[in-house]
């Protein structure tokens, strides 16, 4: 896989990698569970997955499913986070890697990255230029989505993340860039 990408990272740890597709709709949870039976699954990483996993899968893999979300959670959960950020007029936006729970985008945060919102996002006609503004936010955020997801995967695989009472902390917090 691409150097630095999730497949490359998994191969570096000699772990199998499965790509579940980028489409919307119901996830292929039967395939996911079949893979679990075939391999000793340490981690499920979701990137642009845009689907909601069933409680059965979430509970079975509690603390072992990492998602990347295009906002600084808890702000702007759910779909269209970049649009929500633009509509709210934020000056700082960002991305979050978090553990998946049955509550959408509410799981314990592992790492976040922030960026200044480009001033041009708020110039021009607010109705006509919305798509352009959202695209500008997405362009700034997407490279950070990959970065924060890979950082979270590394922290998880190194057993650096501890979750207690719905909150996460790092065993050696000073060793990681969290924001």
Describe each PLM feature range:
Residues 1-179:
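One-carbon transfer enzymes
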């Amino acid at each position: 896989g691409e150097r630095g990408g999730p497949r490359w990272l998994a191969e570096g740890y000699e772990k199998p990698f499965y790509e579940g597709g980028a489409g919307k709709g119901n996830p292929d949870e039967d395939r996911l569970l079949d893979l679990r039976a075939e391999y000793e699954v340490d981690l499920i990483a979701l990137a642009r997955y845009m689907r909601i996993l069933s409680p059965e899968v979430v509970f079975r893999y509690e603390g072992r499913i990492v998602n990347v979300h295009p906002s600084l959670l808890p702000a702007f959960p759910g779909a269209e986070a970049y649009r929500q950020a633009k509509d709210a007029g934020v000056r700082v936006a960002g991305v979050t890697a978090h553990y998946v729970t049955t509550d959408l985008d509410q799981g314990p945060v592992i790492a976040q990255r922030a960026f200044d919102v480009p001033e041009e996002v708020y110039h021009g006609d607010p109705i006509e230029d919305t798509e352009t503004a959202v695209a500008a936010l997405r362009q700034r955020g997407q490279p950070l989505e990959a970065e924060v997801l890979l950082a979270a995967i590394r922290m998880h695989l190194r057993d650096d993340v501890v979750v207690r009472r719905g909150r996460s902390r790092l065993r050696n917090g000073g060793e990681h860039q969290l924001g």
